[in-house]
UniProtKB/Swiss-Prot annotation:
<keyword id="KW-0597">Phosphoprotein</keyword>
<dbReference type="InterPro" id="IPR009050">
    <property type="entry name" value="Globin-like_sf"/>
</dbReference>
<keyword id="KW-0479">Metal-binding</keyword>
<dbReference type="GO" id="GO:0005833">
    <property type="term" value="C:hemoglobin complex"/>
</dbReference>
<comment type="function">
    <text>Involved in oxygen transport from the lung to the various peripheral tissues.</text>
</comment>
<dbReference type="GO" id="GO:0046872">
    <property type="term" value="F:metal ion binding"/>
</dbReference>
<feature type="domain" description="Globin">
    <location>
        <begin position="2"/>
        <end position="146"/>
    </location>
</feature>
<dbReference type="InterPro" id="IPR050056">
    <property type="entry name" value="Hemoglobin_oxygen_transport"/>
</dbReference>
<dbReference type="GO" id="GO:0004601">
    <property type="term" value="F:peroxidase activity"/>
</dbReference>
<feature type="modified residue" description="S-nitrosocysteine">
    <location>
        <position position="93"/>
    </location>
</feature>
<dbReference type="GO" id="GO:0042744">
    <property type="term" value="P:hydrogen peroxide catabolic process"/>
</dbReference>
<comment type="similarity">
    <text>Belongs to the globin family.</text>
</comment>
<dbReference type="GO" id="GO:0031838">
    <property type="term" value="C:haptoglobin-hemoglobin complex"/>
</dbReference>
<feature type="modified residue" description="N6-acetyllysine">
    <location>
        <position position="82"/>
    </location>
</feature>
<keyword id="KW-0813">Transport</keyword>
<dbReference type="Pfam" id="PF00042">
    <property type="entry name" value="Globin"/>
</dbReference>
<dbReference type="GO" id="GO:0005344">
    <property type="term" value="F:oxygen carrier activity"/>
</dbReference>
Length: 146
């Protein structure tokens, strides 16, 4: 990801305030509610039949935390996202057969969740930096597909 020093600082400063458990669960839940076709990758998580079921599904919330924990790890390696996410890219491509477009969708949802939680602190400049990061992470996760 091609970020300026100021953008890297904005991203890492905001990320230091993120409650990974709360926002991870919210981001993955929103993905599954807004884009219901993504639920097919999580059928083994139990009842995902309604928005309420998704929003209160313990496995969805736990996996959302896991996803954002990995995302946070990627923020420590912004200059090597492909290397950082190589194993996850392989897993999602070869074993789980996840449509790589879903990575982009989840990134978009994450930006919305961050904006909702941080309000005025999530300035247009911070949003622009996060848009670059989520695009870079989505690209890194889709790398094995190419």
């Amino acid at each position: 990801v091609n970020l300026t020093a100021a953008e890297k600082t904005q991203v890492t400063n905001l990320w230091g305030k993120v409650n990974v458990k709360e926002l991870g669960g919210e981001a993955l839940s929103r993905l599954l509610v807004v884009y219901p076709w993504t639920r097919r990758f999580f059928e083994h998580f139990g009842d995902l039949s309604t928005a309420d079921a998704v929003l209160h599904n313990a496995k969805v919330l736990a996996h959302g935390e896991k996803v954002l924990t990995s995302f946070g790890e990627g923020l420590k390696h912004l200059d090597n996202l492909k290397g950082t996410f190589a194993d996850l890219s392989e897993l999602h491509c070869d074993k789980l057969h996840v449509d790589p477009e879903n990575f982009r969708l989840l990134g978009n949802v994450l930006v919305i969740v961050l904006a909702r939680h941080f309000g005025k602190e999530f300035t247009p400049d911070v949003q622009a930096a996060y848009e670059k990061v989520v695009a870079g992470v989505a690209n890194a996760l889709a790398h094995k597909y190419h």
